[in-house]
Design a protein with these regions (language model features):
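N-proximal, solvent-exposed amphipathic alpha-helical segments enriched in charged/polar residues
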Residues: 1-47
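Short beta-strand elements
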Residues: 2, 48, 95-99
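Short glycine-rich, basic-tinged beta-strand/loop micro-motifs
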Residues: 10-20, 48-71
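A general secondary-structure signal for short beta-strands and their flanking turns/coil
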Residues: 33, 52-54, 96
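Short, non-transmembrane amphipathic alpha-helical segments
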Residues: 36, 72-92
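Alpha-helical bundle protein-protein interaction modules that mediate dimerization/oligomerization
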Residues: 83-117
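Conserved small/polar residues in nucleotide/adenosyl-binding loops
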Residues: 119-121
Length: 121
């Protein structure tokens, strides 16, 4: 099953990369939400009685994307944290603590690109 998950993740990355290049205009919040859910699934830890998933996510955005989100960053962060809570609840996953989404600027990134780092449990 992990082969299929790996293939799906790679295919998803290629498709997202294609659309990012084909349709410039920066990062969209829905991309960030999908990436969080995918990383929760990929990085889950199966315990004896529970499945644990990461609860802290650090997005590094290009300067133009970060600037575009500046006015709505607080609301976007709350919405993405809610996605973490709801996804965990729907799938029966456990969080170690409250979800936390952080945005930082990375001047080496071009508009429409971002990186996501997880703070593992």
């Amino acid at each position: 099953m992990s082969i299929l998950n790996d293939f799906e993740r790679r295919l998803g990355g290629m498709v997202e990369g294609f659309f990012t290049k084909a349709f410039k205009g920066g990062v969209h919040p829905v991309e960030l939400a999908h990436h969080i859910v995918r990383e929760m699934d990929t990085n889950k830890t199966v315990g004896i009685r529970q499945v644990w998933v990461p609860n802290q996510f650090d997005f590094r955005l290009s300067p133009p994307d970060r600037e575009r989100f500046a006015k709505t960053e607080k609301a976007l962060r709350r919405e993405l944290e809610q996605v973490v809570k709801e996804t965990a609840a729907e799938r029966g996953w456990e969080l170690v603590g409250a979800p936390e989404v952080v945005f930082d600027t990375d001047s080496s990134l071009s508009e429409g690109t971002y990186t996501l780092s997880l703070i593992h449990i």
